[in-house]
């Protein structure tokens, strides 16, 4: 069925007001206790009231590393869609779109229609969201190239599209940025010709002035700052240096060690702007997280989950979820863009290695039948710099799992990842979902005081390799669970139950009046779509899914 563009929830629990959508929602879950070696499961229920402001703001996005491959590609994508550009390629004419974006190209199921078929709507139709074509961009970069020159240097887009975008991007030029050589690879020094001078405190203040200038000059209601610059080395967390907000601000004032990304995070938080870290380093040190908590500003991270790691978070979930004991994961990458060149330095590679290696931890820990405490698969990650392949990253993976009775299963996967074309829609989703979360508040019957989401916005985990979560919260890396979290929280804002995929009405021997089937048997009730009748069976056969014809459903006796 085609995705509908608009819908309304008809329920006494949902009110569409002129300023907000208010919904009553029953959150049902379970709590588990242990008594004498026995697990006791206690169903619980909490009544929430969600309020989502309907007024969509004028939103600006500031990219740190605006002139890099990701920043120039995202800017080009929004311009190409806004201008409705098309261009010739060797395989035919292409048109601008937002493929790869969860919010713009993904759909969600609302339920079943009168024919028993699922009805889907675009993800962006669930709640009022900023239209991506309305985004306003600005940002910083250590390279002074304008965005048109940066686009040409990146070599990501077809030449015909670059030619059309050139006059629109030529006037866009990054603001000077912070360059601290010891945090990134030495090979980046050749690009560093557009720098903020002065002490760390002066650099922090300049970043804050840039944010304020962008807000006023572009007439913006909100700004979201997103780090898409180079991977930095890890910053050691030291008591008295960056362990608290007070100590971190003092460290900046005294000119002690602080990474450029942490400077941008602190500046963003102080200006009330959400900050999202798209690289693997530990930008959001404890002091930055405490500052975000004090200022009630959203932060999220770490490291865009775009290619190889996204596949891994699906495949390992499938293997372990199927009862196969994955024992070895070997991941090899080679790429030729500037990210690859920067990662050729050992300290920067170590940051990436950590974020790519932790992605399977929660899946392993979820199955104590397969894995003893402390047991985990061997996991090796290799990244090599090969300039010729440019932005077209190659990812090769080998997964070896144990089967029953001593058998083994090996999966080998080759994945060509267009690095920036995969990352750009993720950046788009991060900005749109973060802004939406800023308009959502809720309360419970037990705590009627309205509140918002925790400043560490773990709802964004679907989009990050190493997702940050509030202290004490479980880290979820399995992709299906991460997507379900976003979808079900947005459904809760409309008073809708979580999507559980049970389809129980199709599995009952004797449906009641509410769950009544459309016809007596699947074969006798073909589903209609715009192309005409099609068999209900999934393999194209009329009858059961294994190809055998169905018999008439017998009448069951009633008591």
Swiss-Prot record:
Q: Which cofactor does it need?
A: NAD(+)
Subcellular location(s): the record lists: Cytoplasm
Q: What GO molecular function annotation could you give as one example from this UniProt entry?
A: inositol-3-phosphate synthase activity
Keywords from the named record: Cytoplasm, Inositol biosynthesis, Isomerase, Lipid biosynthesis, Lipid metabolism, NAD, Phospholipid biosynthesis, Phospholipid metabolism, Phosphoprotein
Q: What is its main location?
A: cytoplasm
The terms describing its cellular component in GO are: cytoplasm
Query: Its Enzyme Commission number?
Result: 5.5.1.4
Residue numbers bearing the Phosphoserine modification: 279, 357
Please cite one Gene Ontology biological process associated with this protein: inositol biosynthetic process
Pathway named in the protein's UniProt entry: Polyol metabolism; myo-inositol biosynthesis; myo-inositol from D-glucose 6-phosphate: step 1/2
Known catalysed reaction(s)?
A: D-glucose 6-phosphate = 1D-myo-inositol 3-phosphate
Q: Identify the residues that bind NAD(+).
A: 67-70, 141, 177-178, 188, 191, 228-231, 278-279, 303, 306, 337-339, 352, 390-391, 419-420
Its family? Belongs to the myo-inositol 1-phosphate synthase family.
Functional note? Key enzyme in myo-inositol biosynthesis pathway that catalyzes the conversion of glucose 6-phosphate to 1-myo-inositol 1-phosphate in a NAD-dependent manner. Rate-limiting enzyme in the synthesis of all inositol-containing compounds.
Name of the featured protein:
Inositol-3-phosphate synthase 1
Tell me the classification of the organism that encodes this protein: Eukaryota, Metazoa, Chordata, Craniata, Vertebrata
């Amino acid at each position: 069925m085609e995705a509908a563009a608009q819908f309304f929830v008809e329920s006494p629990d949902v009110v569409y007001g002129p300023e907000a959508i208010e919904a009553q929602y029953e959150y049902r879950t379970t709590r588990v206790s242990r008594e004498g070696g026995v697990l006791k499961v206690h169903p619980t229920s909490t009544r929430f009231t969600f309020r989502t402001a309907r007024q969509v703001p004028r939103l600006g996005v500031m990219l740190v590393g605006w002139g890099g491959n990701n920043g120039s590609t995202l800017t080009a994508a929004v311009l190409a869609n806004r201008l409705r550009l098309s261009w010739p390629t060797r395989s035919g004419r292409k048109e601008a779109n937002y493929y790869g974006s969860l919010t713009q190209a993904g759909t969600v199921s609302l339920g079943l229609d009168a024919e028993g078929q699922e009805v889907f709507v675009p993800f962006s139709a669930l709640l009022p969201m900023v239209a991506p074509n309305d985004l306003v961009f600005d940002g910083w970069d250590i390279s002074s190239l304008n965005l048109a020159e940066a686009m040409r240097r990146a070599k990501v887009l077809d030449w015909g599209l670059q030619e059309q975008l050139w006059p629109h991007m030529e006037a866009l030029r990054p603001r000077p940025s912070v360059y601290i050589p010891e945090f990134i690879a030495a090979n980046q020094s050749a690009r560093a010709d557009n720098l903020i001078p002065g002490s760390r405190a002066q650099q922090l203040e300049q970043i804050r002035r840039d944010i304020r200038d962008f807000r006023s000059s572009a007439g913006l209601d909100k700004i979201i700052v997103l780090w898409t610059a180079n991977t930095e080395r890890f910053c050691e967390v030291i008591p008295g240096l960056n362990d608290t907000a007070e100590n971190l601000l003092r460290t900046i004032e005294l000119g002690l060690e602080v990474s450029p990304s942490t400077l941008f995070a602190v500046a963003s938080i102080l200006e009330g702007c959400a900050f999202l870290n798209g690289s693997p380093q530990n930008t959001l040190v404890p002091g930055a997280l405490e500052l975000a908590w004090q200022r009630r500003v959203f932060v999220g991270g770490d490291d865009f989950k775009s290619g190889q790691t996204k596949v891994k978070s699906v495949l390992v979930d499938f293997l372990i979820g199927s009862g196969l004991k994955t024992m070895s994961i070997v991941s090899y990458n080679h790429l030729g863009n500037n990210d690859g060149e920067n990662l050729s330095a050992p300290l920067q590679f170590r940051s990436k290695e950590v974020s790519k290696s932790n992605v399977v931890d929660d899946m392993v820990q979820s199955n104590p039948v397969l894995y003893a405490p402390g047991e985990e698969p061997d996991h090796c990650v290799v990244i090599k710099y090969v300039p010729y392949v440019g932005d077209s990253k190659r990812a090769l993976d080998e997964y070896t799992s144990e089967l029953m009775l001593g058998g083994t299963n090996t999966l080998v996967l080759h994945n060509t990842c267009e690095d920036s074309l995969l990352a750009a829609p993720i950046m788009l989703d991060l900005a749109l979902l973060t802004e939406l979360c800023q308009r959502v508040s809720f309360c419970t019957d037990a705590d009627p005081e309205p509140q918002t989401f925790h400043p560490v916005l773990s709802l964004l985990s679907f989009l990050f390799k190493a997702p940050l979560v509030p202290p004490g919260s479980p880290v979820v890396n399995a992709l299906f669970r991460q997507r379900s979290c976003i979808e079900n929280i947005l459904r809760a804002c409309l008073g809708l139950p979580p999507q559980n995929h049970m389809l129980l009405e199709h599995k009952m021997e004797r449906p009641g009046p509410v769950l009544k089937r459309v016809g007596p048997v699947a074969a006798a009730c073909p589903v209609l779509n715009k192309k005409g009748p099609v068999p209900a069976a999934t393999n194209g056969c009329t009858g059961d899914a294994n190809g055998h014809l169905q018999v008439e459903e017998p009448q069951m006796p009633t008591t």
